[in-house]
């Protein structure tokens, strides 16, 4: 089953004060708050050396390499524990498609790939913006870190029991990275657009809280959204009421009935459950 790195995202977000997720209480978690914490963004032409103490440089160097080493370490540890990497001794190509009715997970996996890479890029950008003192290297580090994560997932899946290397995943990964880069480079874009997600565990996970660490696989518990923020009109210089900055128009997508935690019989579902597969687009 194609796996997504939401667990990695959460760990990254915890370490970045600049990114606000606005998590509510209860099972339902709103990830990737529509208005990510605004950080000062200078153009490359304005990037310059900032006088720093030796202690400051040491701290930034430590954070930089902890991130560069920590991201792949967390990913690989989780992947080998949960995703069956290494179960296959030969390379497997996958042809998963995108959002067709009979595709793998109905497209929920593709929106998850896009969202996860969007969030990891934005999180890592904020880290490297700090470690590189706003210099251009922040772009190189955040792009390479996020892209390498996506490629590593596909390489691992090529040797997993039932996955395979899927070029479609790499394409939607790139879309997520591209949206994130535009938001970081152009504050006006960020003031209008964001990606977010909502998660509420399905029955299988609600009854087995010890399995919640596998929540990236629980696609039927996820909803993925594109947020259009009316606050952006104020940044265009338009005289609009202040309350508009609290209003968003969300376009979302989710699927139900596709996962191994719903279809039976299996080691996850004892009955011959066969729920209807549903794809839903909503505003």
What are these regions (language model features)?
Residues 59-64, 129-141, 183-192, 233-247:
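Short loop/turn motifs that connect adjacent beta-strands in outer-membrane beta-barrel proteins
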Residues 199-203, 253-259:
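Transmembrane beta-strands of outer-membrane beta-barrel pores
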Residues 145, 149, 191-195, 245-251:
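Transmembrane beta-strands of outer-membrane beta-barrel proteins
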Residues 178-182, 224-230, 283:
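Residues on the lipid-exposed face of transmembrane beta-strands in outer-membrane beta-barrel proteins
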Residues 152-174:
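Interfacial helix-loop-helix junctions of multi-pass membrane proteins
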Residues 16-110, 114-121, 125-130, 238-240, ...:
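N-terminal targeting leaders of membrane proteins
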Residues 173, 218-224, 245, 277-283:
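Residues that define the transmembrane beta-barrel architecture of outer-membrane proteins
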Residues 208-227, 231-244:
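Acidic-aromatic/histidine active-site loop/patch
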């Amino acid at each position: 089953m194609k796996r997504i790195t939401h667990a990695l995202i959460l760990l990254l977000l915890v370490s970045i004060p600049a990114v606000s997720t606005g998590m509510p209480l209860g099972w339902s978690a709103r990830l990737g708050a529509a208005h990510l914490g605004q950080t000062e963004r200078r153009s490359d032409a304005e990037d310059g050396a900032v006088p720093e103490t030796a202690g400051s440089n040491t701290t930034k160097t430590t954070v930089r390499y902890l991130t560069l080493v920590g991201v792949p370490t967390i990913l690989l540890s989780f992947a080998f524990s949960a995703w069956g990497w290494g179960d296959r001794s030969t390379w497997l190509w996958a042809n998963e498609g995108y959002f067709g009715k009979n595709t793998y997970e109905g497209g929920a996996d593709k929106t998850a790939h896009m969202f996860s890479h969007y969030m990891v890029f934005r999180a890592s950008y904020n880290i490297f913006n700090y470690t590189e003192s706003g210099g251009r290297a922040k772009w190189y580090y955040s792009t390479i870190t996020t892209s390498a994560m996506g490629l590593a997932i596909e390489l691992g899946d090529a040797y997993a029991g039932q996955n395979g290397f899927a070029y479609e995943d790499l394409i939607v990964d790139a879309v997520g990275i591209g949206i994130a880069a535009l938001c970081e480079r152009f504050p006006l874009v960020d003031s209008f657009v964001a990606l977010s997600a909502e998660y509420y565990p399905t029955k299988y996970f609600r009854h087995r809280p010890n399995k919640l660490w596998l929540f990236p696989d629980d696609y039927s518990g996820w909803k993925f959204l594109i947020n259009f923020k009316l606050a952006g009109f104020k940044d265009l210089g338009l005289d609009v009421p202040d309350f508009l900055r609290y209003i968003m128009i969300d376009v979302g997508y989710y699927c139900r009935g596709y996962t191994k935690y719903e279809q039976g019989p299996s080691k996850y579902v004892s009955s011959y459950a066969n729920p209807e597969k549903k794809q839903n687009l909503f505003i």
